[in-house]
Curated annotation (Swiss-Prot):
UniProt function note: One of several proteins that assist in the late maturation steps of the functional core of the 30S ribosomal subunit. Associates with free 30S ribosomal subunits (but not with 30S subunits that are part of 70S ribosomes or polysomes). Required for efficient processing of 16S rRNA. May interact with the 5'-terminal helix region of 16S rRNA.
Gene responsible for this protein: rbfA
Primary localization: cytoplasm
UniProt-annotated stretches for the region Disordered: 122-147
GO cellular component, one term: cytosol
Similarity comment: family membership: Belongs to the RbfA family.
Record field: transmembrane: none
Species: Shewanella oneidensis (strain ATCC 700550 / JCM 31522 / CIP 106686 / LMG 19005 / NCIMB 14063 / MR-1)
GO MF term list: ribosomal small subunit binding
Protein name: Ribosome-binding factor A
Location within or outside the cell: Cytoplasm
Top-level division of the source organism's lineage: Bacteria
Coiled-coil regions listed: none
Amino acid sequence: MAKEFSRTRRIGQQLQQELAVVLQRDMKDPRIGFVTVNDVDVSRDLSYAKVFVTFFEEDKDVVQEKLNALIAAAPYIRTLVAGRMKLRVMPEIRFVYDSSLVEGMRMSNLVSQVINSDKAKQQQFGSVDDDVIENDIEESDDTEGKV
C-alpha cells in the first residue's frame, strides 16, 4: 500500500517553503523582483526539482528577463536552500514560469467586464419586471394544456 504522502512530495513541500523564504529575504537581485513559488515537483531520485514560479507582470519580455535572472541565480539559490534543509543531496533547481495564476486573473477580469456590461445594458434598456416574467410563465402553462 502506497503512503499518502511520499517522501518526494514532502521534500517538494519543504523545498517550496524554503525557496519562498530565500527568494523573499535573501535574494537582493532587483531583476527578480516579486516572485511567487506556486509548486515544486521533485524527481523520484531527488536529483532534480522543477520549481513553478509566477511574476505579476503581463509583459512577456519582462517575465522572460526575470525568469532568466532566476535561472542564472539557481546555483546560488540552491546553495542557500541547502543550508536550510537537512538533505544528503540537494536537488538541482530548474525554474519554470507558471502562467496559470496570471491566466486565472485575466479570465476573472473578463468575467467581471461581461457582468458590468450586462448591468449597463440593463440600465440602458430598462430591466424586465418580475411580474411580467411571472405572467409569461402562467400564460405558457395555460396554453400547454389547450393543445
